[in-house]
Curated annotation (Swiss-Prot):
Record site feature (Transition state stabilizer), residues: K241
Pathway terms, separated by semicolons: Carbohydrate degradation; glycolysis; pyruvate from D-glyceraldehyde 3-phosphate: step 5/5
The protein's required cofactors: Mg(2+); K(+)
NCBIfam families: PRK05826.1, PRK06354.1, pyruv_kin
GO molecular function, a single term: magnesium ion binding
Protein name: Pyruvate kinase
Similarity annotation: Belongs to the pyruvate kinase family.
Binding sites annotated in the UniProt record for Mg(2+): E243, D267
Binding residue positions for substrate: R50, G266, D267, T299
PROSITE patterns on file: PYRUVATE_KINASE
Keywords assigned: ATP-binding, Glycolysis, Kinase, Magnesium, Metal-binding, Nucleotide-binding, Potassium, Pyruvate, Transferase
Amino acid sequence: MESRLARLTTLQVTAGDNLRRTSIIGTIGPKTNNPEVLVALRKAGLNIVRMNFSHGSYEYHQSVIENARKSEELYPGRPLAIALDTKGPEIRTGTTTGEVDYPIPPNHEMIFSTDEKYAKACDDKVMFVDYANITKVISKGKIIYVDDGVLSFEVLEVVDGKTLKVKSLNAGKICSHKGVNLPGTDVDLPALSEKDKADLRFGVKNGVHMVFASFIRTAQDVLTIREVLGEDGKDIKIVVKIENQQGVNNFDEILKVTDAVMVARGDLGIEIPAPEVLAVQKKLIAKSNLAGKPVICATQMLESMTYNPRPTRAEVSDVGNAILDGADCVMLSGETAKGNYPINAVTTMADTALIAEQAIAYQPLYDDLRNLTPKPTSTTETVAASAVAAVYEQKAKAIIVLSTSGTTPRLVSKYRPDCPIILVTRNPRAARFSHLSRGVFPFVYEADSVADWTEDVELRLKFGIEKAIEMGVMKKGDTYVSIQGFKAGEGHSNTLQVSNA
């Protein structure tokens, strides 16, 4: 069996003609919100469209959804998934008097107040903060960050129920409507603001496939979101964004109830010391891998490509190392939303992923995942893991999975086969959200069901084989592994077969 070190000594240094297994998420903004550009992004490697609900009107987001669907008409290809990223509960400062900025020096003492009379009258003496309980949760000596850490303050005194006395730790400007972070302080904000609830209802109505849920702190936050999505949104996948210390502390419980995870390093790097984000990223990805929950790595991955046609070497290493850590997906934000080189950014990410994936020693990784997964596993997971074992023993070229719900291909992906996973499904939603799982290539089988179950299975397998051959994954005579159910419906994928194309 090839070790990781042995693998690295024979690593190809070019992308070659391999199939990329890591999915790419791109935020859609003014530079990319039209069908033709979306087609170009998809051809470059985009799998999931992200809408950032911190910005834009419903009319704008509606246009993104419509343009994404038009791009599929122009370029059928594989299904495109659409994600709604919530704004999330947040703390912000008020409006400055006259809407002007007020400079402050280091060691400047001032007041933070929750009194509404200062909401539109902030200056260098008093700053309004819209979190009523801030005086209850914070204590003397704690740090407060404003404007993503551009300004730092130390709490000198909790004066009363509405007032904090603080001291600036650096020079800066007091500006309107800036975000506030309370690192090391547990806050009791609700899981969803009223805006978030309305946004989720918009997502349900318009058929989004997944929700990226911001600032998740507890497992109950996830259950609250599921409740708001309701019966009509029961098939929407929830991807929790871990971006504060509470989320990190409660991650094990959160992981049990979420569908997938995003390591959102932007706010996380404000809430905890930046060097610690490295360890947190690796830990959360590893735990997600073991749980078989897809995991996304996000924020500033190719930030310089917002304005430059080429990335920094550090950015390329960041993308590659996230994939080596075990990320199923990597994400672009401003690079595709407002950047000057959105297609270049996706192409760069795709090329980097291809090379990074070649550095993975897949069989030792499979052994680790199998050995560390608690037993007994479900029947579906046992079959999924056995399919991957069969791939290594038979040197199979592909795993073809016939699935209704999309659960089986996700569990096959967990065990990281060194070949593509071809998903054949009649469920378009399952095809779309399967992009969250590394190595899954979804195809929607549109032919009507055949009354004879065995014949129907054979027809779908034939379809999967044809797609694998079209992709160049295998040729006639090659060995493949297949998983299918013994009868119709969800939850019956327990039949494994090794065959030749």
